[in-house]
Amino acid sequence: MIALIQRVSHAKVEVGQNIVGQIGQGLLVLLGVEKDDDRSKADKLAEKVLNYRIFTDENGKMNLNLQQIGGEILIVSQFTLAADTQKGLRPSFSKGADPELAEKLYQYFSQKCAEKVRVANGQFAADMQVSLTNDGPVTFWLNV
C-alpha cells in the first residue's frame, strides 16, 4: 500500500463542477492499493500517516504530527501509484489491486483515519480534479 502525502494549507477535490472533498491545514493523501495489500497494511499505513511528524513545532523543527496540530486529511484514490515503470515507455498496472479490493481497502483506510482526525474523501474511480497548496513544499512517499 502506497501513500504519497503532501503537507497542505488547503486542498480540495472536484468531480465535474462539484466539490466532493475539501480540507484546511493538514495532509493530502494520494492512496495506491496493490494486489497483495490487506487490512493489516492499511492499519500500518494509517498509523504512520496519522503520526508522521512533518509539521513544525514552535522552534521551526518538523516535530509534530497531524493530530497534534488539529489537522485534517483529504484522501484520494490514486491507482497510478502502483504502476510498474521499469520497462518501456508505457506504465503497467499489473501490480495494482482489482477495483473491488482497492475500494474496500480505500474505505477501510479512510475509516481508520477518521477515528482520529477529520477526513474528507475524493470519489473512488472517478475522474477528479485535485487542487492544493503544498505547504513547504513538503511531500513524502510512504510504502508499507
UniProtKB/Swiss-Prot annotation:
GO cellular component: cytoplasm
Subcellular location: Cytoplasm
Top-level taxon: Bacteria
Gene3D superfamilies registered for this protein in UniProt: D-tyrosyl-tRNA(Tyr) deacylase
CDD domains in UniProt: Dtyr_deacylase
Catalytic activity: glycyl-tRNA(Ala) + H2O = tRNA(Ala) + glycine + H(+); a D-aminoacyl-tRNA + H2O = a tRNA + a D-alpha-amino acid + H(+)
Residues spanned by motif Gly-cisPro motif, important for rejection of L-amino acids: 136-137
One Pfam family here: Tyr_Deacylase
EC number: 3.1.1.96
This protein's domain notes: A Gly-cisPro motif from one monomer fits into the active site of the other monomer to allow specific chiral rejection of L-amino acids.
Membership in a protein family: Belongs to the DTD family.
Name of the protein described by the UniProt record: D-aminoacyl-tRNA deacylase
Gene symbol of the encoding locus: dtd
